[in-house]
Amino acid sequence: MLMSVFHNWLLEIACENYFVYIKRLSANDTGATGGHQVGLYIPSGIVEKLFPSINHTRELNPSVFLTAHVSSHDCPDSEARAIYYNSRHFGKTRNEKRITRWVEAAHFRILKITGALTLLAFKLDEQGGDCKEVNIWVCASTDEEDVIETAIGEVIPGALISGPAGQILGGLSLQQAPVNHKYILPEDWHLRFPSGSEIIQYAASHYVKNSLDPDEQLLDRRRVEYDIFLLVEELHVLDIIRKGFGSVDEFIALANSVSNRRKSRAGKSLELHLEHLFIEHGLRHFATQAITEGNKKPDFLFPSAGAYHDTEFPVENLRMLAVKTTCKDRWRQILNEADKIHQVHLFTLQEGVSLAQYREMRESGVRLVVPSSLHKKYPEAVRAELMTLGAFIAELTGLYADIP
């Protein structure tokens, strides 16, 4: 029932005059960090389209109000505010646009929406004036998120996808970011789509060379690899789209092919990058997809599958690392993947969690491993307990230093 409501909502938005804004909510977006910059950041180009009346510096912090309706949850409508913080032009430093008050603060706490994939659909003004309303869907389940990511590809934390609703939701969305054409692809890739491992191997020659920090390296490598993936996708799909389709079945077949490839990449990319970084930084004692109790397969088991099943190996020296791009609800899936390990580690790129979510994770025996540059996006009270990727690697290389 709920999924049919979601599908109907998407169809309505795609068929009418809406502009959609899609992202995963960071802790700053929801106020979970406790910082003063609460609200959704809006790029200047979007402000010009949606709220032209505030795109100026004739006065301090011009703003406009609009009605915010949350279709996904039982929340009362609220009065959202689109504001241009332009104090840089008045002797101070701030220069950014945000949407604030789009859901009352109390509902953030109730819904635990930090990390959730969220769609904001702005009803465009037919006369070119300011938008008067925004219709919001905060995905409450992985099933809802899968519907969106099947259509438009993986939505990674920090990424913003926006555009006319019919273009983004109403058909085959080829890309969400400008394709970088600086890469010269191998000739045989013009004839076949390379595997994820092949793309990562090719990308290695384009990584930033002056960093030895695994936290920085991971984020840079993900960016480069994704740029190359988009270029390969364009190479194989764009001409087909331009030529058009002889039937609906042909269109659906291509859409399914693109969707399956995107999901496959999203599921393996992060694990492959971590595996390479472990080896580069001297952490060689690990197993991927090793079988544990109940035929479970954790992403990484340390130091090996053999050690895990060896009754003589010290249990306190076993480690497990689960890998989730986002961890809003998915973190619970990892709790019983290795019964012998009472504190499991979870690597994520999610931009913050609420204090309540963090406490629930900690009480369940989950320790977060997060790239260092993302720590500031978490509530200040928990930052000291977050582990960097570099610290995780250093701890385990030391722990297993005596293993041949």
UniProtKB/Swiss-Prot annotation:
Catalytic activity of the protein: Endonucleolytic cleavage of DNA to give specific double-stranded fragments with terminal 5'-phosphates
UniProt-listed SUPFAM superfamilies: DNA-binding pseudobarrel domain, Restriction endonuclease-like
Organism of this sequence: Escherichia coli
Enzyme kind, highest EC tier: hydrolase
Subunit (UniProt): Homodimer.
Necessary cofactors: Mg(2+)
Pfam hit, one: EcoRII-C
Disulfide bonds listed in the record: none
Gene Ontology biological process terms in this record: DNA restriction-modification system
GO MF annotation, one: DNA binding
E.C. numbers: 3.1.21.4
Active site: 308
Protein name as annotated: Type II restriction enzyme EcoRII
Keywords assigned: Endonuclease, Hydrolase, Magnesium, Nuclease, Restriction system
Ranges annotated as spanning the membrane: none
Superkingdom of the organism of origin: Bacteria
